[in-house]
Amino acid sequence: MALRAPALLPLLLLLLPLRAAGCPAACRCYSATVECGALRLRVVPLGIPPGTQTLFLQDNNIARLEPGALAPLAALRRLYLHNNSLRALEAGAFRAQPRLLELALTSNRLRGLRSGAFVGLAQLRVLYLAGNQLARLLDFTFLHLPRLQELHLQENSIELLEDQALAGLSSLALLDLSRNQLGTISREALQPLASLQVLRLTENPWRCDCALHWLGAWIKEGGQRLLTSRDRKIMCAEPPRLALQSLLDVSHSSLICIPPSVHVQPLELTANLGEDLRVACQASGYPQPLVTWRKVPQPREGRPRAQAQLEGGLLGLGGHSASDTGSGMLFLSNITLAHAGKYECEASNAGGAARVPFRLLVNASRQQPQQPAQPPPPAARPAGSEPRPEAGSMAFRALGVATQTAIAAAIALLALTALLLVAMICRRRRRRKKARGPPGEGALFVNDYLDGPCTFAQLEELRDERGHEMFVINRSKPLFAEGPAEAPADCGPEQGAGPGLRVPPPVAYEIHC
């Protein structure tokens, strides 16, 4: 046995992979095949031999095809990039591979496909795009693949297939759209597929309405040759009355649509320069309408047109909103005079279309719209009182000149009335005080008159400095005598009052002789 070992050595060497000159590290290279799978690569490795015809890059972490990464591989025939992390394909990513026949992009994270992603692949026969996150196929996505025979799009999230999405696929024989989110498909979308032999549409949430009249009739007339017995079971998901029924078992009279109805409120709005504006357009109907905004061209030429930006994208077929309504938001930012004019909200579905006009007026001044004053909490102000704008506030300045003048006049009149009331009250109080007099004003001072009998003819009327009347007897004696004085025995009645006696205020005058 030991003698035969040298003879087996050349055979063992032939079984080992031949490492070509310049083969990337950790990859295995054969004559025209390079295998770099499951190496946790983040980019396409450098040093791949230019003559490589089959390249395996599956089960890695490649998130982006760098520009020029595949440029040296002009002889490539088969490229396997499945089970990676690709999120997008740049336009012209495979332009340097004109001989490529098979391209596998299964199980990546592709969310969309650009129309120029497959430029240069005129010889491509098989394209695997299953297991990605594609939601829409836009018009002319596969326009540059005239010789494509198999297109695998199953297990995505495709909810909208535009009418010209498959344009250019005149050689396509197999189309797999199963296990997506398709609710409908138009006759125009399948018209370019003149060579189609196998069509797979199962496991989609089909909406059985008037838009699918053609599909049921087409399958019954001749399209069934493209469908296997399993693929013919196109099950309805809605409306609820037709759920779980096969499209082929539903009568045409049951496939109905409700034309859309559109509501925009308000129909006219005035905005200031520099503001942002949002206007909602709500639509109802069945199937869910597709809502779009557009600006109606102005009749005058040379006037700049504002571009309206749709917020939320197109709703309707596959839109993310309520089952019976569609809404689109017109969003205008930094409003200028060019934004003024007439806009139109249109809602359309298979049952028809409806439009509602909306007019935007632009205030040439840059004054910001005034917000109404916020009333204080009920506990913070008396019941029934309303907040009033202050003279210096923005709300007061927003009032008209006539209104401001009227408010100012009313305030001045109220102030004048208050001053008059205060003056009248003060004057009345002063009069009452004078009438009452100071302390001691009601006192009567009694003095002796010793020069003669007490007769009223001898009384002399005097007035003090305050104008009060006084009857004084014997003016030679001072008022307020220090000691008590006795009245003459022959004059006056007995009063028991001395010369300096103070009489209570109610007694006006009292004379003692």
Swiss-Prot record:
Residues 1-20 form the signal peptide. Disulfide bonds join C281-C345. Its main location: membrane. Glycans are attached at N334, N363. It is a single-pass membrane protein. The chain crosses the membrane at residues 406-426. It comes from the Eukaryota. Keywords: Disulfide bond, Glycoprotein, Immunoglobulin domain, Leucine-rich repeat, Membrane, Repeat, Signal, Transmembrane, Transmembrane helix. LRR repeats lie at residues 51-72, 75-96, 99-120, 123-144, 147-168, 171-192. Residues 260-361 form the Ig-like C2-type domain. Residues 365-391 are annotated as: Disordered. GO terms for cellular component: external side of plasma membrane; extracellular matrix; extracellular space. It is found in: Membrane. Residues 21-50 form the LRRNT domain. This is Leucine-rich repeat-containing protein 24. It comes from Homo sapiens (Human). The lineage of its organism: Eukaryota, Metazoa, Chordata, Craniata, Vertebrata. The gene is LRRC24.
